[in-house]
């Protein structure tokens, strides 16, 4: 049986701020920004080249929901990715080489954390 990860919900305290961070800072594509009713708002964004998306919004999680930690984005060139994100205003840690696999870390405005990962060549 095949399974594919489709959607990762991320808690946020400010949907517009998070949407700006992911769309303008990280370069994610805004797939949907809808208000289906009952005070809900759903914003789905997808990293370039990914088939898995994130979703942020209003009425989707408790305000005090735990933050998501250490989501990985695999990139071909971590130095280039780090440079592009830094130029877009995203604070990214220095690159660490962990035995051929390289990592750099960042967090969104709500404290959800991410790792850029370049696999060993």
Predicted regions and their residues:
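Short amphipathic alpha-helices within nucleic acid-binding modules
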Residues: 21, 79-84
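Vicinal oxygen chelate
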Residues: 3, 7, 31-34, 41-42, ...
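Generic preference for hydrophobic
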Residues: 45, 56-58, 116
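Short, charged/polar surface micro-motifs in flexible loops or helix N-caps
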Residues: 48-52, 62-64, 77-80
């Amino acid at each position: 049986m095949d399974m594919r990860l489709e959607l990762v919900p991320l808690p946020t305290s400010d949907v517009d701020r998070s949407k700006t961070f992911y769309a303008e800072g990280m370069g994610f594509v805004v797939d949907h920004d809808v208000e289906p009713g009952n005070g809900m708002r759903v914003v789905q964004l997808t990293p370039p080249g990914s088939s898995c998306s994130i979703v942020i919004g209003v009425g989707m999680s408790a305000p005090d929901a735990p933050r998501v930690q250490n989501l990985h984005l695999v990139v071909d060139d971590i130095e280039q990715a780090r440079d592009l994100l830094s130029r877009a205003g995203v604070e990214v840690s220095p690159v660490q080489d962990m035995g051929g696999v390289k990592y750099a870390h960042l967090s969104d405005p709500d404290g959800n954390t991410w790792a850029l990962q370049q696999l060993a060549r």
